[in-house]
Amino acid sequence: MKKETVLWAMLATTTCVTAQNGKIPTSGVSADSVLTEKDSIKADKEAEIQAVTVTGHRPMYKMRNDALVTRIRNTPLAKEPTLEDVLKHIPDMKQTADGSLEVNGLGAPTIYLNDKKATSAELSHLDVKLIDEIELITTPGAKYDATTGAVLRILTRRTEEGIFGKMQVYDKLSEVNTNHEELTLGWVTKKISLTGFYGYTDNRYNVHQPQEALVRAKDGEYLFGTDRHGKNKANYNATELNFDWLISKQHEVGIQWEGLWLNGGRSEKQQQYYRYPNPAGEDTNSEMKLSDADGEMKYFDAESQQWGHQRSHHINLFHLAKWSKHFSSQIYLDYARNKDSDSQPITEKEGSEMQETLNRSNSNYDIYSGRIEVKQLISDKHSINYGGEWSLMEGKGKTESSADMLGTTEYKNHDTKTAAYLQYQGGVGKWNWWVGIRYEHLTSRYTNLSEKSPDNMERHYDQWFPSFGITLKEPSWHHSLSFRTTTARPSFRQLSGNIYYTSRFQYQISNPKLQPVNTYRLTYSVQWKDFMGMLRYTRIDHSIMYVHEVPEDKPVRYVSTFMNFNKIQKYMAYLNWGHVFGCWRPNAHASITYQRFSVSDHGELISYNGATWDASFDNYFTLPNDYQLSLSYSFDNGGQVGKTKFHPTQNWSLGANKSWMDGRLQVAFSANDLFHQQLFKERTHEHAVDFSQTEDYKLWSYKLTVTWKFNKRKGRYNGMNSAEDELNRL
């Protein structure tokens, strides 16, 4: 008995539980932990222990079917102040050059909140403590839009009745200061939920972006460079109103309105330089350094101001019905209007010469969409899901420039999309599976209203998107194999046919002839105890990338545009491990992706084969009295991505938070990129141009967040935003 008592005491010590006078503090005890409690443990007098509680923690990450599930409730992630802070700690999520988050190799995920597509306002004021778990689905089923690469499903707790509210403010300091304030108020009864939200953000950041292009033209080599320093400012005013009415146990309806007012500006100073080929008969030194130019390098200064305004409104209606025990339906209707405009005066000075350019643009879009989903239960383990959606987007815009070769372009866009899907889900014993098919028809019409050079185009796409998944769950193992096809349609900016002024030596040209990108992915996932792994094969057809060219018929030395490329193949492997050692929760993650891709560029075969790998190590420390600390490190070797080769980056970050008054008041501090090592250096080699640049968005920051809750309830709104995909394209 003595040995057993000592063992229990050691376990209690390693789990950071303190036993004092036979009583154990219960703050922070997980309701979802595996709890073993002995009311009385009789030990020898020498042990002097009257009672011990031993808590075994469930893992923070696990596999469910073909999804990676991150538990939030009663884990250290529940104490993160915002959803963005939580998403940084989900395995396979990466931070991009501008600070946004994406899924490794799959781009930005589509986010669902309780099975409805979430809006940006909803996510900005979501209370992290009300989240149960987050599913990362890298092979979504047929019900999801074909443009969706990955899905994040956020599942929250059920609502409680009463009046609730939350105020949150944060201040983020880097080279400049960003602040945010928000207020959420609501009232919930058994039948009705009414919620209102207002948020204001004053977002500021500086950018340093040096770039250089070595251009190989028929008459020799040109060198163009820019050292760009930008100061950015944007003011966001976001509002949201939700009304949800549970008419009966079988029917629920609701309406949501969102509004966004954005005013922003960018002030930029540049020092540009250039070097023309040596005159005939002189040697051209392609390795010439700037300091060795001996007067052959020319310099000039440029300044620009860019001011933008955006106004958008979005209305969502929904009806949820349960017609019988085995049959249910969901209907969503949306209307959105988006209006934006911007102006950009540019001044370039070289000696006593000065050149001024004014660029302006505006656009207006209306979006109408609807979606219906039906679920038919065949038995406990077998069901059929089917449905359809329709959307219409109409818009017009205008771009104008005082530059001689640009002039004015007026255009119209008209897009209609019709889609239908069917998916079957079933299971027997340890096996579960699903198989689905999705059909999408898209008509895209672009009309150039310019009388001088009309460039009108109408395209029709009819595509089928099959998908399937199968899982095997055993006591210690979990296996999953899944397949999905997706598409990525060009953005309106890429298709518009417009020409954008960058500098006197460079223009950016859109390409109305771009084709959609088609992607095919086969994924195998496995979990064994604390380890999770993944193998993925990806084939990409008609990939869209930047290219730099030297036109012969225009008075400019090089232009950048978009172009479709042939097949890219990627092979990805990923491993994650996490465990709980008392108050310490470490989690380690590593992945590697090898790319096979080559291009025939004006008769030159260029290989872009190469690998990229990354690793991260997160640590959470749960301390007494509701204190929590975190320390994270990540490394990314950059590697080859498409045609671009990136340099390595790394990031050290830490956080600390403390709660009072049963969690109603929370103060959180975080520091990101402590040693300023997130500089994204990239280089691209093409037949005509070697291009390199550094993107320094000053991602290092210190952030203080204060949250006060009137109580812990939340509003209920079960509508789905069926227009979110089209809004994102804008």
PLM regions with names:
Residues 21-76, 96-98, 137-139:
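Short, acidic, small-residue-rich periplasmic hinge/interaction motif at the N-terminus
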Residues 35, 39, 51, 83-86, ...:
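N-terminal periplasmic accessory domains that precede
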Residues 63, 94-139:
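Periplasmic plug
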Residues 131, 144-152, 160-210, 234-237:
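Outer-membrane beta-barrel translocator/receptor signature
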Residues 155-167, 208, 236-239, 267-271, ...:
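Surface-exposed extracellular loop regions of Gram-negative outer-membrane beta-barrel proteins
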Residues 238-263, 303-449, 473-478, 531-534, ...:
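Face-selective signature of the C-terminal outer-membrane beta-barrel domain
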Residues 367-371, 417-419, 509-511, 515, ...:
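Outer membrane beta-barrel strand-and-loop segments of large Gram-negative receptors
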Residues 412-415, 456-461, 487-541, 559-571, ...:
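Outer-membrane beta-barrel signature, preferentially recognizing the C-terminal barrel domain
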